[in-house]
Amino acid sequence: MPQRADGLTDWAAFWSRGKATGKGPVRFTYLPMRAEDVEMFVPYGMTAGGHVCPIDHAYFYPKNMRDAQVRFDVLAPADGFIVVIGHRTQLTGSTEHQREYDDYALTIEHSGTVFTQYDLLTSLDASVLDRLDAALREQLTGKSMMPQTQVRVAVKAGQVIGKVGGRSLDFGVVNTEKVLPGFLTPSLYGHYSWRVHLADPFEYFAESAKAALLKLNVRKVQPFGGRIDYDVDGRLIGNWFLEGSGGYAGNRNDPRGYWMGHLAFAYHHIDPAKIMVSVGDFGGQPKAFWVRGNEPDPAQIGERDGVVKFELVYASIGGSGQKFEGIPTSVQGVALAQVLPGRKLKFEAFPGKTAAQVSGFTSNAKTYER
């Protein structure tokens, strides 16, 4: 992978292969879906299932999503070039979700520094497929798995590039001129280190598109695009990875999922006043919780605080903002955390236990790094 002078992976050079011209800012005149086709917009930062660390993409939830036969147009937000296409027919390294996959992912270059990323398209438009060579086109339209492949297909603002239906559309903006400060060690993210350049989509949409998106947005406080970077040196807040597990990429040979070594202390993507504890291996499964009493605040916890105890409870707000009625309010488990020198953390989860039943770490405690 090409490297920048600051030591970060040069994603612009990798995606565009030196063919891009110009730099941002770029103005998006179209939403990725027509506003009238969208039920809601969920911003960056959710933690759910295998997304243990705050999620690096937003969600456009189409209307009639339960009807998988209904398809909606997916649009290019601005002029550019599709530079990466991928086709997924299975989720490798995981048995968490037993569904049939047939998803398309795209990266669009809008300048030498600004890119958009799409995922979960159910099909690609003929205007895109017809610009590809026959072998690649056959592979994309078949049932075979195709890793992300570099291409160069020109698109215009508002052009239909595919369809989505029966699922959400993933969308994110990357600006390689910006570096998020809340990722202390970008190298731990490997082939996912472009997330350190994730940019708030509301900063790029033209006023009319931005206004439409704000109406659809389930988050009503700034930053409206959400947040994913929470690391603070010497503090508990942020992302952690099981020591020796390969960072964010994790263990791809673990059938339970690469995320089993992930751990995050963050804030809710819709109500950022709420503390989230997201654990990749909570009794063998990924789980995300609120904290009873909404304290202690992980942003205030450091080495001098020693072993800190969290009582974990179910969130009363769902990932798309729905309020859960009648959910258990009892404690679902306990987490112990101790910030160590050298960006290390000692951590142990106790599913089904209460604070009174946990007196300290056991031999099951593990060390995390970042």
Regions found by a protein language model. Give the residues of each.
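Short, solvent-exposed aromatic-acidic interface loops
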Residues: 121-124, 281-285, 350-356
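Ser/Thr/Pro-rich, low-complexity mucin-like regions
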Residues: 168-184, 213, 225, 347, ...
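Short peripheral tails and domain-boundary helices/loops at the edges of structured domains
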Residues: 117-119, 176-215
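Zn2+-dependent peptidoglycan hydrolase active-site motif and core
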Residues: 77-147
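Short, surface-exposed secondary-structure edge patches
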Residues: 71-74, 144-153
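Surface-exposed, glycine-biased beta-strand/turn segments
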Residues: 1-105, 156-157, 198-202, 206-318, ...
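Short hydrophobic beta/alpha edge segments that flank linear recognition/processing sites
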Residues: 97, 103-107, 152-175
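Beta-sheet ligand-binding and adhesion/scaffold domains
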Residues: 295-370
